């Protein structure tokens, strides 16, 4: 437990700033808000770099968040190092707050970009989608699922490269429980890792989540990737999420594309592979090998592919047909 930071008066330096200064951080402007805290830009004087500081109020946060989701988020982020993921640097806990020091992405997020400029050219969509796919391949190869992929969680650095953020719902799948599928990687209904409680936004949720069924979190991630790719090239979500029943009906049908937009058939095919029922839905391995994806990412991540192939090996064991229900 760190030092206390509860004393705060109108005339004094805010307590969170004093705590940050003790650790060498000069806190700047607010760059984001969450349910339980605020994200600030900060300057780390010891290494002369800009960072992001997520400050979580223990008073505002629920016990479930403080005791389960926040420790899990920190645990997951500590083991991750990838150029398309927001990197974790440090966590500091005091009597009233938790401070998480993260890599700073200075270009805003992809949702803001779409709202400002509209649909992406397919070349830009391909760049951002392939970067996201490489980040997710890295996660999945480590047995980690994100479970909250959405446009606002795709941050942009100063060169407009994607950085996947917000690991608050991420989860490590136990390595002792290998993932099984058919050799085609498509019979994923037999996968051994099912989550029971939904995490994330309904607009990006796969049909099995909307139906309240246990779901495969690896495949829920790839469904969300399909929603993201569609929105990149169309500038609107593929399904109307204003009404849950309507949303569920729409996700049961094949997604359609506006006639007035020029979208390549290869791009459409990938979207259709992602936005389909779980037994036929593309895995991250399928995405890496997709013809449209390969146009933008010809160099394959060999280490991740090797690990993913090992995860998806078929098995003759009866365990293949069993489901292990895991808690959130």
UniProtKB/Swiss-Prot annotation:
Q: Which terms does the record give in the GO molecular function aspect?
A: ATP binding; identical protein binding; magnesium ion binding; protein homodimerization activity; protein kinase activity; protein serine kinase activity; protein serine/threonine kinase activity; protein-containing complex binding
Specify the signal sequence span.
none
> Where does the source fall among the domains of life?
Eukaryota
Known activity regulation?
A: Activated by autophosphorylation on Thr-197.
Listed cofactors? Mg(2+)
BP terms from Gene Ontology: fertilization; flagellated sperm motility; peptidyl-serine phosphorylation; peptidyl-threonine autophosphorylation; positive regulation of CREB transcription factor activity; protein phosphorylation; spermatid development
Q: What class of enzyme is it?
A: transferase
Query: What is an example of a Pfam family matching this protein?
Result: Pkinase
**E.C. numbers:** 2.7.11.1
The entry's family comment says: Belongs to the protein kinase superfamily. CAMK Ser/Thr protein kinase family.
By what name is this protein known?
Testis-specific serine/threonine-protein kinase 4
């Amino acid at each position: 437990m760190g030092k206390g930071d509860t004393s705060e008066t109108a005339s004094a330096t805010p307590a969170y700033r004093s705590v940050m200064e003790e650790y060498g951080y000069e806190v700047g402007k607010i760059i984001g808000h969450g349910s339980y805290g605020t994200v600030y830009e900060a300057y780390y004087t010891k290494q002369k770099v800009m960072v992001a500081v997520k400050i979580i109020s223990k008073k505002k946060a629920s016990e479930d968040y403080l005791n389960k989701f926040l420790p899990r988020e920190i645990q997951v982020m500590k083991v991750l190092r990838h150029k398309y993921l927001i990197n974790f640097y440090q966590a500091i806990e005091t009597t009233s707050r938790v401070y998480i020091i993260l890599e700073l992405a200075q270009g805003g997020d992809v949702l803001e970009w779409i709202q400002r400029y509209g649909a992406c050219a397919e070349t830009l969509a391909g760049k951002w989608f392939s970067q996201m796919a490489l980040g997710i391949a890295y996660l999945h190869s480590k047995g980690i699922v994100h479970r909250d992929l959405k446009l606002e969680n795709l941050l942009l650095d100063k060169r407009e490269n994607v950085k996947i953020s917000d690991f608050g719902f991420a989860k490590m799948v136990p390595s002792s429980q290998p993932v099984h599928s058919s050799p085609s990687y498509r019979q994923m209904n037999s996968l051994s890792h099912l989550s029971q409680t939904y995490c994330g936004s309904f607009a990006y949720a796969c049909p099995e989540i909307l139906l309240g069924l246990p779901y495969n979190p690896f495949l829920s991630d790839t469904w969300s990737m399909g929603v993201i790719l569609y929105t990149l090239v169309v500038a609107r979500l593929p399904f109307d999420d204003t009404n849950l029943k309507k949303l569920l009906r729409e996700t049961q049908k094949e997604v359609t594309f506006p006639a007035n937009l020029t979208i390549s058939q290869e791009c459409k095919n990938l979207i259709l592979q992602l936005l389909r029922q779980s037994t036929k839905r593309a895995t991250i391995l399928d995405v890496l090998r997709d013809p449209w994806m390969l146009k933008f990412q010809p160099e394959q991540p060999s280490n991740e592919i090797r690990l993913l192939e090992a995860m998806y090996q078929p098995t003759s064991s009866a365990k293949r047909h069993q489901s292990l229900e895991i808690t959130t």
